Design a protein with these regions (language model features):
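N-terminal acidic leader/helix
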Residues: 1-30, 56-63
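Short, charged, amphipathic alpha-helical segments
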Residues: 10-14, 37-49
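Alpha-helical transition-metal enzyme core signature, strongest for iron centers
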Residues: 20, 47-52
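Charged, low-complexity interaction regions
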Residues: 29-39
């Protein structure tokens, strides 16, 4: 994979990471100061694990 392809892939990973961040923020804002319910907590855990996977992919892509 050349550097241009890596850059495109990295950009795609960043966009996906940002989208997941937005989804997490939306869930937290739904609670609006109230404790998150179990479904919300599980959903956030799932989204956070997806974010971690994207970070692993980005690091692997950059050879870290």
């Amino acid at each position: 994979m050349n550097n241009e392809e890596k850059a495109r892939m990295y950009h795609t990973l960043l966009l996906r990471h940002d989208k997941l961040d937005g989804q997490i923020s939306d869930i937290k804002s739904e609670a609006a100061g109230v404790e998150l319910n179990n479904d919300q907590k599980k959903q956030i855990e799932l989204l956070e694990s997806q974010k971690q996977e994207l970070v692993r992919q980005a690091m692997s892509l950059m050879g870290v």
